[in-house]
Design a protein with these regions (language model features):
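Conserved pre-motif I regulatory segment
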Residues: 2-40
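Short, conserved phosphate/pyrophosphate- and ester-handling motifs at nucleotide-, phospho-/glycolipid
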Residues: 22, 76, 280, 474
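C-terminal accessory regions
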Residues: 369-371, 375-376, 383-523
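ASCE P-loop NTPase helicase motor core
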Residues: 26-27, 31, 36-225
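Intrinsically disordered, low-complexity proline-rich tandem-repeat tracts
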Residues: 137, 326, 342-348, 352-360
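Conserved helicase motor core of P-loop NTPases
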Residues: 3-6, 29, 37, 153-158, ...
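Conserved SAM-binding loop
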Residues: 18, 72, 276
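Short polybasic linear motifs
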Residues: 223-230, 324-327, 332-344
Length: 523
């Protein structure tokens, strides 16, 4: 097949007349898919509303038609769920795809990068602005970006498509998003690389107040980047936002705010379609307490039905737990999918492509930072080692068919103003647990035994109703309440403020409610 033929297939599958930028990307993709060069990577950057998701859906539809496979990946479970929603196909998190447990000589399970057994496969990764090139302290990982690239290109005839928006917040602790930076990718990895940035927002998208304001902020970020590079950026002065004649981005007063919180969070069965985005963990704690006490009318620290976010990767509960319920649920899911597959085979009008990537049973090898969970049942509360714990049954909310798990959670992080346990708190817990193992004389044996302690491995969580902007990144909610960012100088916005606000308002699919924004913000 030649490039022009594939381009025609892509255009036909696109379904309507593409914008100039979309047409260019489709033409680039036709070359990218067919290239036989070593380690091919295509970096697709784009503003919100430029149609990146439509392009991905078109590619996913086209690849099986030409005998190629694909894998859909994203940094978090929420981002993978969004990707699966707009493509109609299963998507996985990067961590669940890249890593696995491996037994080492002493019988201990250790995390390691998995082997890429895929052939002739395009790995499509969304929300790449979240991917860091910094190590996270684990000996088995250089960095998520390193591991992703080396995993993909260790397979036979595999290609990598990175998609994202460079205007969003970079990974915590970084000034830029390395996976969105052409020069970093080109200089740090041995790649055949091409890139394109989509800037033309679709006309119908600009009818949305959310995307209208996002585009204006995005343009100011681009301008600020140029000035910052020349050391000529002193901040951007308010006003910034235009909410006139739009019904999807609204400034609200305190009374309306409380009423809208009731509407959004009052029913535990459906309150996972809204989020409050805050400027700090301290502010998120305040909003979470208010929502639980005044809206949900919860008096206890934890209740069945509570939605929580995991704030630190946890490898203990899924690797150590001999969970018969889990095995039965996975087996039942497998039987159901086999039955569905047989039904499809027997129906000539539903013949699937032999090249379509299969819908995988969820990989529950660990519980990831950023995973949303729901408390299904509370078995007991207890206090030990100077900390408070709860034994609970949880459901992973962002993974279809994921089995329930029995875990122990640490309650201190629910109210902490830090992202997770502080270093001092973690040290205090470690030392308290270690006291129970001092009869083991050898330090290495003692540490190994401590790794099996359920209290030491308790899941660190926060309430999931109000979150910091970084914690919402990659996710999407119907209704998003955005608290005004803190400005030391009341009318001057730094580049980071622009990125923060851009990321926050683009989390909404239907409505943005602006909370505590002064009149100076508005045109």
């Amino acid at each position: 097949m030649d490039r022009n033929t594939l381009f025609s297939i892509l255009l036909n599958n696109f379904g309507f007349t593409p914008t100039e930028g979309q047409a260019k990307v489709l033409y680039h993709l036709s070359a990218f898919i067919l290239t036989e060069k070593e380690r091919p990577l295509y970096l697709l950057r784009g503003y919100a509303g430029t149609g990146k998701t439509t392009l991905v859906s078109t590619l996913v539809k086209t690849l099986p038609q030409i005998g190629m496979r694909y894998q859909l990946l994203a940094p978090t479970g929420r981002a993978a769920k969004v990707m699966s929603s707009y493509t109609g196909k299963p998507a996985s998190t990067l961590h669940r795809k890249l890593y696995r447990f491996q037994a080492v000589a002493n019988g201990e399970l250790r995390m390691t990068r998995d082997v890429n057994k895929h052939k002739n496969t395009v790995f499509i990764v969304d929300e790449c602005s979240m991917i860091s090139d910094q190590g996270d302290g684990y000996s088995w990982s250089r960095s998520l970006l390193d591991d992703l690239i080396e995993y993909v290109f260790s397979g036979s005839c595999c290609k990598l498509l990175l998609i994202g928006d460079s205007a969003q917040l970079p990974p915590v602790g970084l000034d830029i998003s390395p996976a969105m930076d052409f020069d970093i990718l080109r200089n740090s990895f041995n790649l055949t690389i091409a890139t394109y940035e989509m800037k033309e927002v679709m006309r119908q998208a600009l009818e949305s107040g959310i995307l209208h304001n996002a585009t204006e902020i995005r343009n100011k970020i681009a301008m600020s980047n140029e000035q910052w590079a020349m050391s000529d950026f002193d901040g951007y002065e308010l006003p910034l936002l235009n909410i006139n004649n739009f019904d999807d981005i609204i400034k609200i007063d305190p009374m309306s705010f409380e009423e809208l919180l009731w509407q959004s969070f009052g029913d535990k069965r459906s309150n996972n379609d809204a989020v409050v985005i805050c400027r700090s963990n301290k502010r998120a704690n305040m909003f979470n307490q208010a929502i639980r006490s005044r809206v949900l009318q919860e008096e206890g620290e934890l209740s069945a039905g509570d939605k929580l976010m995991v704030v630190k990767n946890n490898y203990f509960w899924t690797s150590q737990q001999d969970n018969e319920t889990t095995r039965q649920q996975v087996a039942e899911t497998q039987r159901r999918r086999v039955a569905e597959s047989q039904s499809t085979i027997n129906n000539p009008f539903q013949s699937p492509s032999p090249f379509q990537s299969p819908s995988p049973i969820p990989n529950i090898s660990f519980i990831a930072n950023g995973d949303m969970i729901e408390i299904m049942k509370i078995n007991k509360f207890e206090e030990l080692y100077g900390f408070h714990f709860a034994d609970v049954e949880i459901q992973l909310m962002d993974y279809e068919d994921a089995p329930s798990l029995s875990v122990k959670i640490l309650l201190e992080t629910l109210h902490s103003d830090s992202p997770a346990l502080t270093n001092d708190e973690a040290k205090r817990l470690y030392q308290a647990v270690e006291e129970d193992y001092m009869d083991i004389p050898k330090a290495s044996d003692r540490r190994k035994a401590m790794k099996e302690n359920p209290y030491f491995n308790a899941l660190q969580v926060k309430y999931g109703y109000a979150l910091t902007c970084h914690k919402t990144q990659g996710g999407q909610w119907n209704n998003v309440f955005v608290e005004a960012p803190y400005l030391p100088e009341e009318t001057i916005l730094e580049l980071g403020d622009l990125r923060w606000l851009y990321t926050a308002i683009t989390r909404a699919s239907e409505k943005v409610y602006l909370v505590n924004f002064k009149d100076e913000w508005f045109m």
